[in-house]
């Protein structure tokens, strides 16, 4: 086992009857969160709340770099420590906000943070972000940010049989012609052999099934 926190599985209290549940942080504790948790015990509570406010503002799309630098100077925080705290808070909140409130309950969230030895009062501050009045705005901003890249708007395909081609080996061999249109208006056309098309169909169906099974399994464990 590596000495780095990222390689350590997410642990639970020895007496926890739900020791097999999955953390909202994943099966492996993110290194940013592990580093942050080690620093919170000696961190001034006022400084923590100011950092948390900056992280929330960052998640809402605001640029807080100058304010963070000023806080680091006034609180006498080394740059490395400041970066570790911000990265850990950002990762923790981002992971929690990925799950709908119906999947991640407040009590479960608090219990799992306490298992990381995060002080009780700081757990309450973090929970107020994930389950408080700012949640709708954070969800809205996350959806907008996720829509920056173009997505598939239309996908069509048809089977084509070439009866005349310069490649004699391909004569009378069926293929699949595909047309992909994206939300930004761009379109792509390409040709795929039927064997590869069948592999693609199988792979996509398998991935979708595994994703659905994993989602159901995680939801059940988080609700335990």
Curated annotation (Swiss-Prot):
Expression by tissue: Highly expressed in heart, stomach, jejunum, kidney, liver, and adrenal gland. Expression was generally higher in adult organs than in fetal tissues, particularly in heart, kidney, and liver.
Entry keyword set: Acetylation, Cytoplasm, Nucleus, Transcription, Transcription regulation, Ubl conjugation pathway
Domain of life: Eukaryota
Alphabetized PROSITE patterns for the sequence: COMM (PS51269)
Span of domain COMM: 151-215
One Pfam family per UniProt: COMM_domain
Keyword set includes Ligase: no
Cystines in this chain: none
Record has Zinc as a keyword: no
Residues annotated with N-acetylserine modification: 2
An annotated GO cellular component: nucleoplasm
Main location as per UniProt: cytoplasm
Localization (cell): Cytoplasm; Nucleus
InterPro entries assigned to the protein according to its UniProt record, in alphabetical order: COMM, COMMD5
Subunit structure: Component of the commander complex consisting of the CCC subcomplex and the retriever subcomplex. Component of the CCC (COMMD/CCDC22/CCDC93) subcomplex consisting of COMMD1, COMMD2, COMMD3, COMMD4, COMMD5, COMMD6, COMMD7, COMMD8, COMMD9, COMMD10, CCDC22 and CCDC93; within the complex forms a heterodimer with COMMD10. Interacts (via COMM domain) with COMMD1 (via COMM domain). Interacts with RELA, RELB, NFKB1/p105. Interacts with CCDC22, CCDC93, SCNN1B, CUL2, CUL3, CUL4A, CUL4B, CUL7.
Family statement: Belongs to the COMM domain-containing protein 5 family.
PANTHER family associated with the record: COMM DOMAIN CONTAINING PROTEIN 5, COMM DOMAIN-CONTAINING PROTEIN 5
Function: Scaffold protein in the commander complex that is essential for endosomal recycling of transmembrane cargos; the commander complex is composed of the CCC subcomplex and the retriever subcomplex. May modulate activity of cullin-RING E3 ubiquitin ligase (CRL) complexes. Negatively regulates cell proliferation. Negatively regulates cell cycle G2/M phase transition probably by transactivating p21/CDKN1A through the p53/TP53-independent signaling pathway. Involved in kidney proximal tubule morphogenesis. Down-regulates activation of NF-kappa-B.
Protein's name according to its UniProt entry: COMM domain-containing protein 5
Organism: Homo sapiens
């Amino acid at each position: 086992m590596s000495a780095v926190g990222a390689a350590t599985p997410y642990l639970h209290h020895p007496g926890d009857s739900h020791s097999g549940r999955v953390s909202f942080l994943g099966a492996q504790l993110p290194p940013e969160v592990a580093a942050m948790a080690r620093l919170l015990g000696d961190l001034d509570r006022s400084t923590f709340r100011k950092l948390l406010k900056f992280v929330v503002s960052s998640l809402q799309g605001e640029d807080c770099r100058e304010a963070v630098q000023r806080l680091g100077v006034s609180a006498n925080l080394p740059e490395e420590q400041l970066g570790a705290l911000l990265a850990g808070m950002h990762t923790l909140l981002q992971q929690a906000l990925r799950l709908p409130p119906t999947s991640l309950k407040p009590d479960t969230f608090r219990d799992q943070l306490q298992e990381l030895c995060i002080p009780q009062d700081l757990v309450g501050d973090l929970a107020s972000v994930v389950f408080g009045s700012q949640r709708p705005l954070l969800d809205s901003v996350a959806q907008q940010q996720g829509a920056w890249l173009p997505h598939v708007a239309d996908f069509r395909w048809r089977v084509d049989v070439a009866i005349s081609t310069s490649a004699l080996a391909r004569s009378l061999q069926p293929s699949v012609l595909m047309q992909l249109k994206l939300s930004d208006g761009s379109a792509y056309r390409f040709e795929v052999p039927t064997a590869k098309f069948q592999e693609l169909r199988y792979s996509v169906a398998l991935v979708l099934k595994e994703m659905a099974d994993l989602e159901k399994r995680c939801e059940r464990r988080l609700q335990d």
